[in-house]
């Protein structure tokens, strides 16, 4: 069995159980609700900082994915952002996949897709 594939399956299983880490009292203020991100609780009486039962979970090293597959696409490829054909040609098709930048227009996108097919490079957003 391939080690990378095994670790990707483990990462997928871990991600299903991982909670959304939101800041303390995110539900209370509209400015927090519309901008969901983690901020460490720092209040002296904060139950969340003290890790009390029933309060929201905090990020810690135990929630991270296996080191070998951290940051990889679920398909197992390393993502590389591509703006033109020249950047596409620098990609290693065995371990990297291209993601076409959102600023690329339709004409250049077609050129990139055609060249990717020739080179055998996987495009994540064709």
Curated annotation (Swiss-Prot):
Highest taxon of source: Archaea
Pfam families associated with the record: Ribosomal_L32e
Cellular component, GO annotation: cytosolic large ribosomal subunit
CDD domains referenced in this protein's UniProt entry, alphabetically: Ribosomal_L32_L32e
Transmembrane segments: none
The entry's keywords: Ribonucleoprotein, Ribosomal protein
GO molecular function: structural constituent of ribosome
GO term, biological process aspect, one: translation
HAMAP family on file: Ribosomal_eL32
Assigned protein family: Belongs to the eukaryotic ribosomal protein eL32 family.
The protein, known as: Large ribosomal subunit protein eL32
UniProt lineage: Archaea, Methanobacteriati, Methanobacteriota, Thermococci, Thermococcales
Gene: rpl32e
């Amino acid at each position: 069995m391939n080690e990378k594939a095994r670790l990707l399956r483990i990462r997928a299983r871990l991600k299903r159980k991982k909670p959304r880490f939101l800041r303390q009292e995110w539900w209370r203020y509209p400015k927090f609700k519309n901008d969901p991100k983690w901020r460490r609780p720092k209040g002296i009486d904060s139950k969340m900082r003290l890790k009390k039962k029933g309060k929201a979970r905090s990020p810690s090293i135990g929630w991270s994915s296996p080191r070998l597959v951290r940051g990889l696409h679920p398909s197992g490829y390393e993502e590389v952002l591509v703006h033109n054909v020249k950047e596409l040609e620098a990609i290693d098709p065995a371990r990297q996949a291209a993601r076409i930048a959102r600023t690329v227009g339709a004409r250049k996108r077609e050129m990139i897709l055609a060249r990717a097919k020739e080179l055998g490079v996987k495009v994540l957003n064709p």
